[in-house]
A protein has these predicted regions:
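Short phosphate-binding/catalytic loops that engage adenosine nucleotides
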Residues: 58, 132, 450
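N-terminal, positively charged nucleic-acid-binding surface of large information/translation enzymes
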Residues: 8-13, 17-103, 454-461
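Structural preference for alpha-helix termini/caps and helix-kink/transition segments
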Residues: 269-272, 276-465
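The substrate-binding groove and active-site-proximal loops of carbohydrate-active enzymes
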Residues: 78-84, 108-114, 230
Length: 465
């Protein structure tokens, strides 16, 4: 298994801290709003990593957090006259619902920052005792980054390293010094009683503390195998996590760092500040979650994905092919083709080379369809094909529906009954040799994006986009 390590800026062999085990921490959302496609892409990228590792024989523990203490949450909760717990719980439920629709495997743990305040306080106390952290006059506590000779080694963020000293008004020793603890400021603020005084943790200390409490190993130079997240988190968040961990405990936080690329909307980086965020829940109004998943995983996780509906519909054709083949082989038993399994897994073991894996899949779909055309009653072949498709389901998380359900997505039960009534009406017209009426019914359904196919077993229908 090879993965791209952001810190080394190259692909490296994955060699876990404990043989045949992999522990992964993925930075989750700050829960003050609904999740957007950037959140979806990050979750899918590292869901693919987990699935690939598991199918390669690793026992995987994946932790993805919820940041439920943050300035954005506090500000929005105040505006909406809610507690931060009430507000964050709304968006935790929304995020979970959205990711379930995308067929995401549930993380091993989903810690909330608010559940690990003691660990955060302990880490800050350690930094104060070592004279690496310092207080300013308003009670806030900062980390002195000059005490970490390796600061900037992860992100190589030159501008941060070259910052000079600034005036005493802000009281920070260096511009890149970051807050560990924010003291309680009174009305419209949130604070927790602690040995540090009333206040709340900074963003960066939250993730490091949750890692130590949920995943960290003992007696190792690294605490976890893989720390992952979006490219936007590389600096300052991940840089500062790594820094405070070295300073507090003298170890590196992670052996490997992995980051997924941005999602652009119309060639412009998606962000709430630009007002072009595309929420998952809005995308799900137009497209089934599996169709979105299939589209989002189709571009290599480190590349920028420029979201547009034209490409989404093109990618849907791949799903259509999977389900059409599945439709032909349902109800058969057999073993997977070992060469197919080996070839496609090797693609994913090469830093999740999903494009190459999908090319192998496309080749299998075409060749097996041709073989079925030549020998449609070959049960052994059908069983092998179904086993191949089952492996794709496990590896990529697509192709798991019943084909008839897939081809009838977006049609309500009442609409289905109307279609069945039309099919029955068309059948009677054909029996009475009223072919003009039969054709008229077919045309009427086509106008509503319903295609009819006459088979030896009767007429079946599909909805098309």
């Amino acid at each position: 298994m090879f993965i791209y390590d952001t810190k080394l800026k190259q692909k490296v062999p994955f060699e876990p801290l404990v043989q045949n085990k992999a522990n992964i921490y993925v930075c989750g959302p700050t829960v003050y709003d609904d999740a957007h496609l950037g959140h979806a892409r990050s979750a899918i990228a590292f869901d693919l990593l987990r699935r690939t590792l598991e199918l390669s024989g690793y026992e995987v523990m994946l932790v993805r957090n919820f940041t439920d203490i943050d300035d954005k949450i506090i500000n929005k909760a105040f505006k909406e006259n809610k507690s931060i717990q009430e507000l964050s719980s709304i968006y935790i439920e929304s995020y979970t619902r959205d990711l379930n629709a995308l067929n995401m495997k549930k993380p091993s743990l989903e810690p909330k920052a608010s559940e690990y305040l003691d660990a955060m306080v302990h880490m800050i106390e350690t930094l104060l005792e070592k004279n690496i952290a310092y207080r300013v006059s308003n009670g806030d506590i900062y980390l002195d980054t000059s005490k970490d000779k390796d600061y900037g080694s992860l992100s190589v963020h030159n501008s941060s390293i070259e910052f000079g000293r600034i005036g005493l008004v802000q009281e920070k020793r260096l511009e890149q010094d970051f807050v560990l603890w924010k003291s309680y400021k009174g009305d419209n603020d949130v604070g927790f009683d602690s040995p540090l005084g009333k206040g709340r943790p900074g963003w960066h200390i939250e993730c490091s503390s949750m890692i130590f409490k949920t995943l960290a190993l003992t007696n190792t130079p690294y605490q976890i195998d893989i720390h992952a997240g979006g490219a936007d988190l590389l600096f300052p968040h991940h840089e500062n996590e790594a820094c405070q961990t070295r300073c507090a405990f003298g170890v590196e936080l992670a052996k490997y760092w992995m980051h997924n690329g941005f999602v652009n909307i119309n060639n412009e980086k998606m962000s709430k500040s630009l007002g072009n965020s595309f929420f998952i829940k809005d995308a799900l109004k137009n497209y089934d979650g599996e169709i979105l998943r299939n589209y989002l995983l189709g571009v290599h996780y480190r590349s920028v994905l420029n979201f547009n509906e034209e490409d989404l519909l093109v990618s849907k054709k791949r799903l259509d092919k999977i389900y059409r083949l599945k439709q032909r082989v349902l109800g058969t038993l057999g073993g997977i083709n070992p060469n197919f399994k080996k070839e496609i897994l090797e693609c994913m073991q090469d830093d999740l080379n999903v494009s190459k894996a999908l090319s192998v899949l496309e080749s299998m779909l075409s060749s097996t369809n041709e073989k079925l055309d030549q020998n449609p009653k070959n049960k052994a072949l059908k069983g092998e094909i179904l086993a191949n498709l089952k492996f794709i389901e496990e590896l990529l998380g697509i192709g798991f529906k019943d084909p008839s359900a897939y081809f009838q997505l977006g049609v309500s039960e009442s609409e289905k009954q109307e279609i069945e009534n039309k099919i029955e009406e068309r059948k009677r017209a054909k029996e009475q040799k009223d072919f003009l009426k039969a054709d008229s019914i077919r045309e009427e359904l086509l106008n509503h994006k319903i295609a009819l196919m006459d088979t030896p077993q009767g007429t079946i229908w599909e909805k098309f986009f």
